[in-house]
Each structure stands twice: as structure tokens, then as C-alpha cells.
């Protein structure tokens, strides 16, 4: 990770860390790096989620883009994967999404996509960072007709929805689907999409007011949708995050079906249809041990990456694999989109339900999970967790006690000032005890004093 760019763009508290001034400079420098070889008036798409700070940062970012001669097409509120799809579909030179995904409302972020709809490479981000840190801004400052322009392309949302519908062979007539839109970017998209697919819909978290994004709703709070599914007697529930690149499902009896299980279900179906490239799925080190055991039983190969959907996508592109993702609900169907897509993943999952005639609980039960516990600890300097001797010592002690029947993963978050402690063991009791033992040392050594 660089000085400005984390694993998912530039993030920070809006108006104090991620300021309008920084957004303006990101527009100038990022726009220049991504479009300098395009010729006159390259086109860049700009979109945002529902955060109150989104319009402020959008205005500043667009000013920066226009100042280097870029034609901006404003999409308004749309999901991150919607932007990624439209970038390539519209032949844009690049695109920018203003969102902090699942983070709290105070945060925001800016992430760029290239003309191919993929997130930027490390080299491209490093070049932008070097320009940001240059003492004097020497980039072009055109005037008159050399300046860029701004136009609206709100109809892009409908084009994206129409595309999603073409990725499946079934409609959802006869299915009652509960949707939790996290008061975020999918709030209008999801209900429109599933209505077009002839589903019976109940929705929650679909009334954004600028302040309630991810607030007790969405993929990071699936328990809210679980209760809603039971109350509405729905066949399945789908919980998205603030920018719509994640989904967590709920089965008809209120059980959580996470990204591992969604990937497992879809991988099995794709293989049966002869559509799983190289009989391989890409996942991260956070996937449950039960996920890998289930894949072995199906004789499906796996490739494991570091945490972060960008690393999953990199491995998929390198190996020409078409399915990958994360336990957190970032799932990439590379035949259809270039990034994690909650809406796409949701309709692929329900398409499997309809094609097989099975309830989601039946499909999910085919993968058995190890007890897992994840603790997030707010710290002063997350990057020193890997070289703290006391933390290393307690991890070694726990791993020795596990004797190969479990695992420990302690790592800095790529997007927040957190250390994540993840433990899997043979029993829930052992998992809880090991996780608390390690977390206690991390808190003692590194935690912020509230």
C-alpha cells in the first residue's frame, strides 16, 4: 500500500483526511495519468454512493478532471460494479467511484478504474502518488475550448440493469426475495432489477438520507436481514454493502450464507455445466477451512491470494479463471464483470436455486464450516502487528496447541485502522478461547486508548 492508496483506492474521514482539496488534486493527477495518451477530450465517468460527503467530493474531483481537459459523464448514485461495467460499455477512458464501501458514513473514498473496467495497477497508483507529492503542479492547464465539460448520464443505471438480466437464463417468478440495500448505492437498483425479473420483493435499508448508509443494515449486519426474511417469510434474502460490490445471503430459515458458501454453490453449478474455467476457483486466506475441504470433495482446484478483491482479480486474470472472491461477499464472475458485484452475485445464486429446484438452505448445507471467530481491534499503528514480539509469541503458542487442527490469521486491515484477528478451530469453545487470548495481547500492545 502507498501513502495515499490502500487496497481499495484512497480512503479517509471526509473533509478532514479526504478533503475537497485532495479530491481536486486526485482529479487532476489521476485524470492526467489515465488519459494522457488518449488524445483530445478523453471521457471519464464519475459516480458516488449515498454518503452526505459524496456531492462535496464529487464537485471537487470533477473540477480537477475538467481542469486537465477531460469530458466528465456524471452517473449520479450507482454501485461500484455498475461504474466498472459502464466504463467499458461506454468506451470511456477511465472512471472514478466516490465511496468508502462498507465503512461508516464519516469515511469516504475515491477509486479509479482504467478503460478496461479494472482497478488500477500498483504502478499506476504509484505514478499518481508521485504527482501528488510533487512540490509544484506542472500539469497542463488548458483554457477555452481546451477545458473539459460535464454532462449527466443517469440512464447508465438502466443500461447496467439490462445487462445484468442477460447474464442468467431464468426469471424469478414464484420467488419471494428480501433485499437489504444498506441505505447505499443499490437502493434504487436492486428493487428495479428484481422487479424486472418478476420476483416478489420485500425491501429494507432502501431509504438513504446521506447519513444512514451501513448503519445497522447491509452485508456487515446480516442479522437484520435474517430477522426480516423470517418476518416476511421470504425464500431468500440478499444484503448488499454501501457501494454494492458485496453480497451476503440469508436462507429461508434465517441462516447466514456468506461469500464462501455462495462461491461454493456457484462453483459446483458452473462445473456441472462445464463452465468453470480450469476447474478452479480463486479465494483469499480468509476463506474457511471447510470451504477448501468442500472443494476437495468436489475435486475443484483452488488458488489462494492475500486479502483484497484486487488480488483475487489479479490471480483470476493471470490464470484465466472465471470465478473467485472473498468470504466477506466480494464475488467476481469474470465472464460478466471486472470487479466484485453484489447484484450480479445475487442473481447468479438465485439462478442456481431455480435451475436446481433446491432451497438455499439445501445448497448451503453441502459445505460444512469450521467454527470461526473474527475480532477487529482499533489500533494506533496497524502495520506493526506483524513484527510485535508478544503478538508473534501468543500466535505461535496457539498454533502449537492446535496441532494442525485449525489456523490463525492476524493482519492489518487494508482499508481501516484495524488489526483483524481470525481464528478457526475444531470447536466453538476452542475458537473463542484462542481468539480472545490473541486479541487480548493485541489490545494490550497496540490498541488505542479510548
Swiss-Prot record:
Keywords: Isomerase, Magnesium, Metal-binding, Phosphoprotein
Cofactor remark from the record: Binds 1 Mg(2+) ion per subunit.
Signal peptide residues on this chain, from the entry's feature table: none
GO cellular component: cytosol
Residues annotated with Phosphoserine modification: 101
Enzyme class: isomerase
UniProt key word Metal-binding: yes
PTM comment: Activated by phosphorylation.
Any GO molecular function: phosphoglucosamine mutase activity
GO biological process assignments: carbohydrate metabolic process; peptidoglycan biosynthetic process; UDP-N-acetylglucosamine biosynthetic process
Annotated residues for binding of Mg(2+): 101, 241, 243, 245
Top-level taxon of origin: Bacteria
Catalyzed reactions per annotation: alpha-D-glucosamine 1-phosphate = D-glucosamine 6-phosphate
UniProt EC number: 5.4.2.10
Known function: Catalyzes the conversion of glucosamine-6-phosphate to glucosamine-1-phosphate.
Family label: Belongs to the phosphohexose mutase family.
Protein name: Phosphoglucosamine mutase
Organism of derivation: Listeria innocua serovar 6a (strain ATCC BAA-680 / CLIP 11262)
Lineage: Bacteria, Bacillati, Bacillota, Bacilli, Bacillales
Chain's gene name: glmM
Amino acid at each position: 500500500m502507498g501513502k495515499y492508496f490502500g487496497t481499495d483506492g484512497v480512503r479517509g474521514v471526509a473533509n478532514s483526511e479526504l478533503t475537497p482539496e485532495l479530491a481536486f488534486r486526485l482529479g487532476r493527477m489521476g485524470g492526467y495519468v489515465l488519459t494522457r495518451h488518449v488524445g483530445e477530450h478523453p471521457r471519464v465517468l464519475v459516480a458516488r454512493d449515498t454518503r452526505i460527503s459524496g456531492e462535496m467530493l464529487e464537485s471537487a474531483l470533477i473540477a480537477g478532471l475538467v481542469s486537465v481537459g477531460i469530458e466528465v459523464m456524471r452517473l449520479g448514485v450507482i454501485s461500484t460494479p455498475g461504474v466498472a461495467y459502464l466504463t467499458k460499455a461506454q468506451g470511456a477512458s477511465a472512471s472514478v467511484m466516490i465511496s468508502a464501501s462498507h465503512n461508516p458514513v464519516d469515511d469516504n473514498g475515491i477509486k479509479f478504474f482504467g478503460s478496461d473496467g479494472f482497478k488500477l495497477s500498483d504502478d499506476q497508483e504509484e505514478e499518481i502518488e508521485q504527482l501528488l507529492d510533487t512540490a509544484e503542479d506542472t500539469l497542463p492547464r488548458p483554457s477555452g475550448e481546451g477545458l473539459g465539460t460535464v454532462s449527466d448520464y443517469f440512464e447508465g443505471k438502466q443500461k447496467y440493469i439490462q445487462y445484468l438480466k442477460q447474464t442468467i437464463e431464468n426469471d424469478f417468478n414464484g420467488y419471494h426475495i428480501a433485499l437489504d440495500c444498506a441505505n447505499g448505492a443499490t437502493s434504487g437498483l436492486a428493487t428495479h432489477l428484481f422487479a424486472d425479473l418478476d420476483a416478489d420483493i420485500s425491501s429494507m435499508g432502501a431509504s438513504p438520507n446521506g447519513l444512514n448508509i451501513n448503519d445497522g443494515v447491509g452485508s456487515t449486519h446480516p442479522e437484520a436481514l435474517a430477522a426480516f426474511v423470517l418476518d416476511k417469510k421470504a425464500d431468500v434474502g440478499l444484503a448488499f454493502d454501501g457501494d454494492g460490490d458485496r453480497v451476503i445471503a440469508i436462507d429461508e430459515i434465517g441462516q447466514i450464507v456468506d461469500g464462501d458458501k455462495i462461491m461454493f454453490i456457484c462453483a459446483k453449478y458452473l462445473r456441472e455445466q462445464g463452465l468453470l474455467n480450469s476447474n478452479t476457483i480463486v479465494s483469499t486466506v480468509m476463506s474457511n477451512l471447510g470451504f477448501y475441504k468442500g472443494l476437495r470433495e468436489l475435486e475443484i482446484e483452488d488458488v489462494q491470494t492475500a486479502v483484497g478483491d484486487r488480488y483475487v482479480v489479479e490471480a483470476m486474470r493471470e490464470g484465466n479463471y472465471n470465478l473467485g472472491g472473498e468470504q466477506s461477499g466480494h464475488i467476481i464472475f469474470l465472464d460478466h464483470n471486472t470487479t466484485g458485484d453484489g447484484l450480479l452475485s445475487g442473481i447468479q445464486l438465485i439462478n442456481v436455486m431455480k435451475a436446481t429446484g433446491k432451497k438455499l438452505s439445501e445448497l448451503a448445507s453441502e459445505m460444512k464450516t469450521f467454527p470461526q471467530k473474527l475480532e477487529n481491534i482499533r489500533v494506533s499503528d496497524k502495520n506493526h502487528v506483524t513484527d510485535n514480539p508478544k503478538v508473534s509469541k501468543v500466535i505461535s503458542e496457539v498454533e502449537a496447541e492446535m496441532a494442525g487442527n485449525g489456523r490463525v490469521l492476524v493482519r492489518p486491515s487494508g482499508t481501516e485502522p484495524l488489526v483483524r484477528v481470525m481464528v478457526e478451530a475444531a470447536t466453538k469453545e476452542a475458537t473463542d478461547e484462542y481468539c480472545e487470548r490473541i486479541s487480548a495481547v493485541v489490545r494490550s500492545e497496540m490498541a488505542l486508548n479510548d
